[in-house]
């Protein structure tokens, strides 16, 4: 009998997508499913991006430069300068989504068996890409009771071993929505300098900060050789399907190394770069309007969640995600039950089980991630559905 690889056996299922067959079956049965499980915004992709592609139809769809079109990278330099990130276009490698940026960063900076420290809960695909790269994720737990702030720095330092080569931070955070402040990032800078570590900084949601402003890890001059910035246009411009991201670093050795991986996959998507370059010409008020819409959705979601008996959800400071604690026995069972065995007014709701965002077994059992990417009317309807579901769920666990 043929066997699969050990690596394939270790690859985790996506907590965000693994319930998709159940949702599809629910829809075939006539239910409306409110998708709060995945960060796919319903806000329209800017028309200028689509028009740019239409206006650049070529009889031959060519490879681009392996690092990405120079014109796009040069315009990105101006974009980053607006965020107090001072770089040259040669400090940028365009990738096929932030996913490839994460994988290339792991492959270029860490060896098999090396360790990367990540506060949990964390974006589930970090673990998947660590498996692909043969590295080990070391988690440090944050808590819903304090809003998922950065774990105590001494707890992070206690996890450092001779195999530790990096710390990874997502700011604002997916899945919690927590916005790390400058003082928290300074503590991480101190650690990476003290122990000579890389700091992978996933900043894909920097435009969406509601409680304070975004501070980039790239603004630490002393640690500039240590910081690898991971970026994406997916959520910024509601263009997830374009699959375009970036790696940004002033460390030339890292750029030269990652460039070899970029050359091996030939080039990032041709038309995605044309669309993304056009997006950089959008007026500044594009983000003012978009941010205000997400903030309004956040406010509705958090108010509705915390109004449900025995539900608690801290107020996220950024991105468009929230982690909530529910009075349930098992989030995986509950999320499946919502799609298989429950409906309210011919609707149900799809959530992402919290366990999939933790590396520590048993953590997140009563938590779910919700993405507030639907309009407020749909969020209200989804919360009506969730409130009714919690009244009748067989595995409800009430506080004593």
Predicted regions and their residues:
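PLP-dependent class I/II
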Residues: 2-4, 9-14, 19-34, 39-56, ...
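Short gly/ser-rich anion-binding loops that grip negatively charged ligand groups
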Residues: 39, 59-66
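Generic short alpha-helical segment signal, independent of protein family or function
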Residues: 54-61, 81
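Conserved N-terminal alpha-helix of the aminotransferase class I/II PLP-enzyme fold
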Residues: 63-96
């Amino acid at each position: 009998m043929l066997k699969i690889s050990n690596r394939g056996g270790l690859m985790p299922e996506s907590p965000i997508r693994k319930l998709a067959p159940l949702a599809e079956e629910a829809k075939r049965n006539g239910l409306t499913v409110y998708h709060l499980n995945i960060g796919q915004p319903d806000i329209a992709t800017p028309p200028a991006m689509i028009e740019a592609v239409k206006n650049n139809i070529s009889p031959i769809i060519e490879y681009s430069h392996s690092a990405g079109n120079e014109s796009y990278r040069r315009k990105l330099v101006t974009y980053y300068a607006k965020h107090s990130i001072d770089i040259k276009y040669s400090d940028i490698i365009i990738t096929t989504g932030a996913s490839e940026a994460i994988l290339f960063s792991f492959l270029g900076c860490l060896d098999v068996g090396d360790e990367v420290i990540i506060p949990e809960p964390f974006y589930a695909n970090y673990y998947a890409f660590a498996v692909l790269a043969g590295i080990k994720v070391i988690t440090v737990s944050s808590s819903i009771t304090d809003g998922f702030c950065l774990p105590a720095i001494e707890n992070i330092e206690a996890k450092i071993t001779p195999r530790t080569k990096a710390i990874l931070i997502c700011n604002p955070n997916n899945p919690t929505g927590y916005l790390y402040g400058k003082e928290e990032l300074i503590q991480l800078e101190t650690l990476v300098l003290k122990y000579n570590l890389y700091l992978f900084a996933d900043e894909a949601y920097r435009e969406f900060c509601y409680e304070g402003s975004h501070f980039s890890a790239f603004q630490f001059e002393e640690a500039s050789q240590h910081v690898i910035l991971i970026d994406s246009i997916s959520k910024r411009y509601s263009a997830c399907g374009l699959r375009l991201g970036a790696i940004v670093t002033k460390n030339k050795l890292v750029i030269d190394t990652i460039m070899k991986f970029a050359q091996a996959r030939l080039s990032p998507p041709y038309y995605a770069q044309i669309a993304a370059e056009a997006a950089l010409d959008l007026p500044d008020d594009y983000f003012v309007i978009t941010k205000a819409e997400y903030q309004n959705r956040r406010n509705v979601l958090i108010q509705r969640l915390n109004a449900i008996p025995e539900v608690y959800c801290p107020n996220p400071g950024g991105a468009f995600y929230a982690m909530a604690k529910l009075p349930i026995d098992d989030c995986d069972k509950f999320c499946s039950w919502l799609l298989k065995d429950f409906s309210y007014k011919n609707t149900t709701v799809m959530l992402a089980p919290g366990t999939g965002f933790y590396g520590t077994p048993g953590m997140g059992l009563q938590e779910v991630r919700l993405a507030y990417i639907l309009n407020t009317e749909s969020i209200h309807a989804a919360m009506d559905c969730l409130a009714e579901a919690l009244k009748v769920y067989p595995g409800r666990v009430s506080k004593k």
